[in-house]
């Protein structure tokens, strides 16, 4: 069971909930609070001693990317035509080709051709009567992974033939490193209750770790890469960057695919740099960082997060920029609620946001006034652009999710103030909202969908699980990486501490429980993606990408709040440094 019944029965996040929320928005009451901001001395406030910004925004403005030139775009288009012909060729190993194209970051150019090729592949299989018993482990696992990734109904029972009479995976499979890696990768597309894939994951994990020790080859590098973080859970754009470098070293590398992949990556990266320069000017113009110097100045990290959530395609600039704005505001308000604001001030701010009344700033302290105006202006600008383009007023939806997030922030602040350690389920029911995933995804939905319908809005309201599961993954990844630092700052509850306190277990046991909960939530999201898939495939991809960028950012620590050299190198690889 993923969580207890309180998780399964959570009401829609668009309906009022009894449990307080503490993230980025407001607390709605029937009447305004009849109190005013406290005159707390700055020296009396907590300080998080956050790491300063490590990026020079003036230097970012000087970025110049060679691949902005139209001749590269023309060359890329010619190469794409060659790749299309390859996909349509019935004599190629189509599954291997599709997998390579996908890992190289090229598949978005060929969605129609790939769909037709997979349909053709399945049709030929059916006509020829070929069954699974003639397939190798690699072929079977690759077939399963690709078909499930592309939404085909395929059962994991196809792996039964690789078991012995005792129901265990055959010992002889262990020496097939390529097949074992393919089975390992496939196991991460499992649904709840698919025991054979759980067994496959356990079997391959143990033996691949043993097989990779003391060896060196391109295949072993791939094994170590997947063991570090599974292929399906990786940010696809960063994975393309890594795979291009790996693929170039292979003797069987196709030169057309390799050149097409390099050009495509660099062209999209040049678009990202233009987006980043615009966002750098926006952030500097907002003037929030110097006025709210107690908080984290993380424009670059927020842009990286937005780029990771958004499909890695040049036409999604508006979505990247919109999410960068949202993420930047979330980061600062999180610091207000976690560290700087007094409880009275947080109550006032939560109520002000929920009322969405500009006059509410009159009773806010000065530092909150500027942030309220920044939030008010940004959200209203999103609403204005959407009304202008679609005729739909999305303001109630945006204010609602911001309000719910701030209520969740406020609840956490109260727990901390009262030195209260909540039960694990109470914490998580609040924390999946406070982590801000719903705010990010709701903005994404409206930024991606300019053809907004009543049916679509109903879908957004009535399918909360699609937003809840990636938010839980986001929260758990965050807690695993930041719990120690948060405790040092006196920020109180997180999932690990709550579980330890409630169950009387060690930190190691609690970590294992959270990791298991992460895996179970991924299974739930994998299934929800199929049975409750939104009309927009891009929004569906963005939902999964939220979970992926969470793993990426918190894989080695707090890559957002305290970015280290590894975090900086990831940003440079995706945004700043072209492939030679």
UniProtKB/Swiss-Prot annotation:
Catalytic reaction list: (2E)-geranyl diphosphate = tricyclene + diphosphate; (2E)-geranyl diphosphate = (E)-beta-ocimene + diphosphate
GO MF: (E)-beta-ocimene synthase activity; magnesium ion binding; terpene synthase activity; tricyclene synthase activity
Enzyme Commission number: 4.2.3.105, 4.2.3.106
Residue positions binding Mg(2+) 2: 334, 338
GO biological process terms, semicolon-separated: defense response; diterpenoid biosynthetic process; response to herbivore; response to jasmonic acid; response to wounding
Organs and tissues of expression: Expressed in leaves.
Induction note: Accumulates in response to wounding, methyl jasmonate (meJA) and infection by Spodoptera exigua (beet armyworm), a lepidopteran herbivory. Also induced by lepidopteran oral secretions.
InterPro entries: Isoprenoid_synthase_dom_sf, Terpene_cyclase-like_1_C, Terpene_cyclase_plant_C1, Terpene_synth_N, Terpene_synth_N_sf, Terpene_synthase-like, Terpene_synthase_metal-bd, Terpenoid_cyclase/PrenylTrfase
Pathway per the UniProt entry: Secondary metabolite biosynthesis; terpenoid biosynthesis
Annotated residues for binding of Mg(2+) 3: 478, 482, 486
Entry comment, domain topic: The Asp-Asp-Xaa-Xaa-Asp/Glu (DDXXD/E) motif is important for the catalytic activity, presumably through binding to Mg(2+).
Protein name: Tricyclene synthase TPS4, chloroplastic
Taxonomic classification: Eukaryota, Viridiplantae, Streptophyta, Embryophyta, Tracheophyta
């Amino acid at each position: 069971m993923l969580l207890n019944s309180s998780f399964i029965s959570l009401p829609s996040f668009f309906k009022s909930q009894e449990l307080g929320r503490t993230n980025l928005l407001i607390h709605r009451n029937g009447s305004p609070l009849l109190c005013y901001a406290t005159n707390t001395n700055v020296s009396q406030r907590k300080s998080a001693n956050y790491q300063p910004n490590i990026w020079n925004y003036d230097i970012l403005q000087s970025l110049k990317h060679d691949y902005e030139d139209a001749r590269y775009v023309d060359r890329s288009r010619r190469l794409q035509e060659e790749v299309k012909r390859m996909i349509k060729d019935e004599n190629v190993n189509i599954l291997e080709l599709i997998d390579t194209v996908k890992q190289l970051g090229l598949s978005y150019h060929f969605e129609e051709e790939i769909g037709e090729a997979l349909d053709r592949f399945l049709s030929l299989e059916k006509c020829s009567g070929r069954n699974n018993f003639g397939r190798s482990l690699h072929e079977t696992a690759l077939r399963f992974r690709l078909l499930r990734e592309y939404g085909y109904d395929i059962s994991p029972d196809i792996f039964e033939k690789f078991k012995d009479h005792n129901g265990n995976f055959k010992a002889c499979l262990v020496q097939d490193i390529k097949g074992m890696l393919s089975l390992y990768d496939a196991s991460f597309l499992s649904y709840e209750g698919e025991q054979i894939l759980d067994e496959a994951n356990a079997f391959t994990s143990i033996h691949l770790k043993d097989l990779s020790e003391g060896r060196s080859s391109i295949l072993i590098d791939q094994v170590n890469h997947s063991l570090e973080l599974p292929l399906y859970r990786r940010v696809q754009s960063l994975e393309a960057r890594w795979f291009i470098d790996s693929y170039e070293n292979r003797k069987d590398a196709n030169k057309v695919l390799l050149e097409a992949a390099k050009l495509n990556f660099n062209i999209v990266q040049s678009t990202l740099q233009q987006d980043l320069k615009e966002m750098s000017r926006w952030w500097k113009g907002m003037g929030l960082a110097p006025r709210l110097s107690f908080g984290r100045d993380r424009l670059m990290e927020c842009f990286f997060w937005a780029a990771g959530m958004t499909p890695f395609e040049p036409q999604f600039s508006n979505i990247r920029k919109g999410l960068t704005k949202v993420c930047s505001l979330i980061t600062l308000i999180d610091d207000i609620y976690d560290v700087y604001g007094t409880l009275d001030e947080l109550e006032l701010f939560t109520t002000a946001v929920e009322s969405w009344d500009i006059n509410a700033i009159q009773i806010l302290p000065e530092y909150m006034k500027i942030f309220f105006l920044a939030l008010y202006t940004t959200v209203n600008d999103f609403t204005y652009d959407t009304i202008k383009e679609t005729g739909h007023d999305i303001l109630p939806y945006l204010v609602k999710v911001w309000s719910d997030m701030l209520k969740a922030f406020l609840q956490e602040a109260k727990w901390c103030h009262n030195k209260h350690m909540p039960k694990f389920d109470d914490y998580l029911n609040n924390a999946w909202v406070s982590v801000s995933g719903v705010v990010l995804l709701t903005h994404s939905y409206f930024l991606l969908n300019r053809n907004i319908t009543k049916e679509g809005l109903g879908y957004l309201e009535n399918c909360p699980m699609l937003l809840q599961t990636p938010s839980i993954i986001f929260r758990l990844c965050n807690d695993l990486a930041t719990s120690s630092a948060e405790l040092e700052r006196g920020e109180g509850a997180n999932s690990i501490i709550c579980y330890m306190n409630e169950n009387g277990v060690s930190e190691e046991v609690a970590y294992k429980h959270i990791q298991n909960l992460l895996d179970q939530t991924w299974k739930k999201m994998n299934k929800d993606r199929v049975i409750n898939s939104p009309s927009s495939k891009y929004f569906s991809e963005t939902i999964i990408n939220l979970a992926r960028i969470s793993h990426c950012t918190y894989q080695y620590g707090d890559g957002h709040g305290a970015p280290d050299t590894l975090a900086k190198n990831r940003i440079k690889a995706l945004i700043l440094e072209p492939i030679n």
